[in-house]
Amino acid sequence: MGQTIITNDGRFEWDEVKNIQNIEKHGIDFNFAIKVFDDEDKIEEYDDFHSTYNEERYRVVGMVDNDILFVVETELESGRIRIISARYAEKIYVDKYFLLRGKNYDF
């Protein structure tokens, strides 16, 4: 496990080694991915399949700079959000985002 990075506002954290691996694999930096939480139309869902007794995980799908991102996170006892992974959303989640929000794909 690498160094834990905490954002200046204390709202988010992540493992920096995991962030570097995520950038290499998906091309998304966690510092960029946290902007998904600013999207008022974001979709947040409990991830029952990947959650455990010790860690509840959530999927967040939202728009950042005209791209739809898929972020996996967990909420810590402190209230801070820990980013686990981030990638560009697959078509099924892009479709769901626009369908639920009544938006067009034109951007």
Question: Across the structure, where does each feature detected by a protein language model lie?
Answer:
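Ribonuclease/tRNase effector modules and their secretory precursors
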Residues: 1-107
